[in-house]
C-alpha cells in the first residue's frame, strides 16, 4: 500500500452567511454547505490551502 492516498476529514463548524463569496465557494469546493457536515478529502497541498482559507469555519476531525 505504498500508493495509498492520505485522507483528511473536515467538519464545518461555522456558517457561510455574511461571508465573502470566495469563502462560500471554498466551502462548496470542500463539499461542505451546512454546519455539522463532514467531508473526507485527499490530503493534498491544494486541499490544505482551501482549509487554511476557511480555517475559522471548519475543523479537522481526523487525519489518516
Swiss-Prot record:
Keywords associated with the record: Ribonucleoprotein, Ribosomal protein
Ribonucleoprotein is among the record's keywords: yes
Pfam families: Ribosomal_L30
GO MF annotation, one: structural constituent of ribosome
Annotated GO biological process: translation
GO CC terms of this entry: cytosolic large ribosomal subunit
InterPro entries the record matches: Ribo_uL30_ferredoxin-like_sf (IPR036919), Ribosomal_uL30_bac-type (IPR005996), Ribosomal_uL30_ferredoxin-like (IPR016082)
The family this protein is said to belong to: Belongs to the universal ribosomal protein uL30 family.
Assembly, per entry: Part of the 50S ribosomal subunit.
PANTHER family: LARGE RIBOSOMAL SUBUNIT PROTEIN UL30M (PTHR15892:SF2), MITOCHONDRIAL RIBOSOMAL PROTEIN L30 (PTHR15892)
Protein name, entry field: Large ribosomal subunit protein uL30
Gene assigned in the entry: rpmD
Amino acid at each position: 500500500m505504498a500508493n495509498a492516498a492520505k485522507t483528511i476529514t473536515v467538519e464545518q463548524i461555522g456558517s457561510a452567511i455574511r461571508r465573502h463569496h470566495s469563502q462560500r465557494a471554498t466551502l462548496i469546493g470542500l463539499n461542505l454547505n451546512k454546519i455539522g457536515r463532514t467531508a473526507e478529502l485527499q490530503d493534498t497541498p491544494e486541499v490544505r490551502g482551501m482549509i487554511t482559507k476557511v480555517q475559522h469555519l471548519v475543523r479537522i476531525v481526523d487525519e489518516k
